[in-house]
Amino acid sequence: MASAGVAAGRQAEDVLPPTSDQPLPDTKPLPPPQPPPVPAPQPQQSPAPRPQSPARAREEENYSFLPLVHNIIKCMDKDSPEVHQDLNALKSKFQEMRKLISTMPGIHLSPEQQQQQLQSLREQVRTKNELLQKYKSLCMFEIPKE
């Protein structure tokens, strides 16, 4: 099979016309390379994933239902009486998370209102970043180098 692909590739090479070393008639010399322009700061749509600290990982475990569901499935496979304890723990975790969600800021807003608020905040960040860049470019102060 590999030889058939190689043979087909060789046939394709045989079909191509030979290239000439003469320059094309309408070509112009390339301009000298210039440094790339500095792009304006853009709001990031999705931040790059950061390595998690152990405290952050433990915090996320507090919000995860997966370990409890895993324990429930294991207990059901073994016909263990602990399944009721795990089910109660899962129910209490659901209640705890409902309370936590109800205290979050902006939860009373509709998704459209949340999107509008998000766009407004992103615009504010963009404007402030632009102002900060302008302020930095004024060179009013000499920054001491240490």
Swiss-Prot record:
Record-listed Phosphoserine modification sites: S110
Residue ranges of coiled coil: 112-139
Residue numbers bearing the N-acetylalanine modification: A2
Any one Gene Ontology molecular-function term assigned to this protein's record: transcription coregulator activity
Residue stretches of biased makeup (Pro residues): 26-52
Compartments reported by the entry: Nucleus
Span list, region Disordered: 1-62
UniProt main location, coarse: nucleus
Classification via InterPro entries: Med7/Med21-like (IPR037212), Med9 (IPR011425), MED9_metazoa (IPR039242)
Gene Ontology biological process terms, A to Z: positive regulation of transcription elongation by RNA polymerase II; positive regulation of transcription initiation by RNA polymerase II; RNA polymerase II preinitiation complex assembly
GO CC field: core mediator complex; mediator complex; nucleoplasm; nucleus
Summary of subunit composition and partner proteins: Component of the Mediator complex, which is composed of MED1, MED4, MED6, MED7, MED8, MED9, MED10, MED11, MED12, MED13, MED13L, MED14, MED15, MED16, MED17, MED18, MED19, MED20, MED21, MED22, MED23, MED24, MED25, MED26, MED27, MED29, MED30, MED31, CCNC, CDK8 and CDC2L6/CDK11. The MED12, MED13, CCNC and CDK8 subunits form a distinct module termed the CDK8 module. Mediator containing the CDK8 module is less active than Mediator lacking this module in supporting transcriptional activation.
Family per similarity comment: Belongs to the Mediator complex subunit 9 family.
Function according to Swiss-Prot or TrEMBL: Component of the Mediator complex, a coactivator involved in the regulated transcription of nearly all RNA polymerase II-dependent genes. Mediator functions as a bridge to convey information from gene-specific regulatory proteins to the basal RNA polymerase II transcription machinery. Mediator is recruited to promoters by direct interactions with regulatory proteins and serves as a scaffold for the assembly of a functional preinitiation complex with RNA polymerase II and the general transcription factors.
Cited PANTHER family: MEDIATOR OF RNA POLYMERASE II TRANSCRIPTION SUBUNIT 9 (PTHR20844:SF0), MEDIATOR OF RNA POLYMERASE II TRANSCRIPTION, SUBUNIT 9 (PTHR20844)
Official protein name in the record: Mediator of RNA polymerase II transcription subunit 9
Gene that produces this protein: MED9
